[in-house]
Amino acid sequence: SAASDVYKRQQESIAIENDDKIFNIRDCVYISKNINVPVILDYHHHICNHDELDINDYLKDILSSWHNATPKMHFSSPKNKTKKDFRSHNDYINVDAFINFIDILKPFNHDVDIMIEAKAKDEALFRLVRELKYKTNYTFIDDTSFEV
């Protein structure tokens, strides 16, 4: 029926993301396995709410939760290191922290889409790309996509 087709499409568009205060990555992987939805890893949220969990212990499950789709991830830098502002997004991305995140993902040899969350929006993205081109040997496919 048309209603069941709509329901199926809605169900297929649901994903779960770890947050910065309550649901950590372990919680999301557990939920994902029980209701078969993909996990969006928000790395900044993981840093804020890691509960001493090693992200490497969960990446295989996060990546496989997407089945044949490209996994989605979010990356942002904290506004500053004070407890009050650590959870807030910076205007720009800290390139060294981003490179470190890519280095964490590299051993899994898996394509991912990383959404940059920064107050300066496109300007932050293009600054990050310039810094990556200067600091790394990544192979750029287009203006903002690269291979490691």
Regions found by a protein language model. Name each.
Residues 17-28, 32:
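Basic- and aromatic-lined ligand-binding clefts that recognize polyanionic substrates
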Residues 23, 44-49:
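Short acidic, Gly/Ser-rich segments with clustered Asp/Glu that frequently serve as metal-coordination loops
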Residues 30-32, 41, 50:
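Long, repeat-rich segments with strong aromatic
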Residues 37, 48-148:
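Histidine-acidic metal/acid-base catalytic patches
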